[in-house]
Amino acid sequence: MSMKCFQCQETVKNQGCTVKGVCGKPDNVANLQDVLIYTLKGISFYAHEGRNLGVKDEEVDRFVMDNLFATVTNVNFSEQDFIDRIKQSFKIRDQIKEQVMLKYREKYGENLDNKVPSNATWYTEDELNFKTKGEEVGVHSSDNEDINSLRELLTYGIKGIAAYAHHAYTLNQKDDEIFAFMHKGLAATTDDSLSVDDLVSLVMECGKFGVNTMALLDKANTEAYGHPEPTQINIGVRNNPGILISGHDLKDMQELLEQTEGTGVDVYTHGEMLPANAYPAFKKYDHFVGNYGNAWWQQNEEFEKFNGPILMTTNCLVPPKDSYKDRVYTTGVVGFDGVTHIPEREAGESKDFSQIIEHAKKCAAPEELEQGEIPGGFAHNAVLSVADKVVEAVKNGDIKRFVVMGGCDGRHKSREYYTEFAKALPQDTIILTAGCAKYRYNKLDLGDIGGIPRVLDAGQCNDSYSLVVIAQKLAEAFELEDINDLPVSYNIAWYEQKAVTVLLSLLYLGVKKIYLGPTLPAFVSENVLNVLVDKFDMRPNSNVDEDLEKIMAGE
């Protein structure tokens, strides 16, 4: 069996993984994911047609959203889980198909059949056919390289939207227009009548809905847990057993804190859960100790030393070592064969974390990795509350430039560029960050400017929305019509599909001169890249000295 996956930055030789994913995903799982995406596109064909007929089904919307999320890099490695998801996709497809066919016949007096693509009809009961189908329906679905590139770019952007919409939905925030675009975009990726220009327009529309979805999630998080506050976050440990919670799901964080209170078990965040330390609703828990460790790719060593159980709420999961595999718990859309999965919450109920809590009680306290504190909680509400101070610092020359260094971290040695770039920035610059890219520089002693820390961490990757809001409000304060006229530069590190969504969102907002690295996406063809360069002046990283000179000159 073979595979072809190039959806992440670390793909082999920046061309594609064909034997096994660098992420650890085996070829059989990669092919099952391709089949699931194929059937989801078939579901979205009916859901998109249905909306034109007044047919909506929230169960269908949620199924597509959640299953797209399951295919994001480092979320789910479980062969059996994807087999089950494909089987369920047939049932969901039949459910929406029946509703749409009925309405179509009522309106037009004939069946929809002559318009239906193969992904809306394909069916098999033989699981072996799932695997062979995956090789057939993978990433090269068209003979046109640029069409393929744009279809993949659109699909990955929609995956990121689905991930953010999933988190908002968990907190009872939803937007039907987001679901509608999700279906429209997926259906478009199998429509051979669409031209390159049509797909470019859809990619830009994906950026629009990326902004809308991040705004929705910001609303969900802040209404549920308050606006993040500037916070000194502990990175040391205490002498109690603990649970390490990783991923992005704040609802899981809330329920874990509630259920561990008074048990003698401490809670620590890891990776992208670090920003949870800045939310007012979570600060009231005395057993919420702080953050343990660094970015996702270092988890093999750090999970080993944590000693207690680890709860993976979303990505990024690295295939666990046998030495601690029995301490890994997954939940939500995360999956890995051979580890304990905590089921989804019932309507109106909390998830049951009793098993992981009892496990923690039997474990030793975490081994100390480091001591001290790091700053966090500088989302848009906190920064804009001192906007006058920031504006004054710019006007009097204390702050010469802001550099947005949001995005993802990863294994590649080339990412040391971001550490060196942060160190090399002049003392009159401020770094605005969100996402796990922060771990490349958030523990450096970069000082402050008039009491404003030189690294302002807005939060998780979805909190890139905060950076956009900050830039827009600064443009208003300086009475600028074009956001590109601000002393703000963008040096973005990408890794997976949510970063694609963030990038498309920035492009939709008209942001130009984005530096992107550490490599350009393998799925972007030369012609598509030329469009991005010509229209948005996007460029790859080169080296610290060269990029720094250009960025400080506003180039």
From Swiss-Prot:
Cysteine persulfide: which positions carry it? C408
Under the heading Pfam families, the entry gives: Prismane
- GO BP, one annotated term: response to hydrogen peroxide
Which residues participate in [4Fe-4S] cluster binding?
Answer: C5, C8, C17, C23
Name the EC number(s): 1.7.99.1
Q: Which UniProt keywords apply?
A: 4Fe-4S, Cytoplasm, Iron, Iron-sulfur, Metal-binding, Oxidoreductase
| Record-linked InterPro entries | HCP/CODH, Hydroxylam_reduct, Prismane-like_a/b-sand, Prismane-like_sf, Prismane_a-bundle
Q: What sort of enzyme, by top EC class, is this?
A: oxidoreductase
Give the protein's cofactors: [4Fe-4S] cluster; hybrid [4Fe-2O-2S] cluster
Q: Supply the HAMAP family for this chain.
A: Hydroxylam_reduct
Query: To which protein family does this belong?
Result: Belongs to the HCP family.
Role played:
Catalyzes the reduction of hydroxylamine to form NH(3) and H(2)O.
Q: What is this protein called?
A: Hydroxylamine reductase
The species is Natranaerobius thermophilus (strain ATCC BAA-1301 / DSM 18059 / JW/NM-WN-LF)
Q: Encoded by which gene?
A: hcp
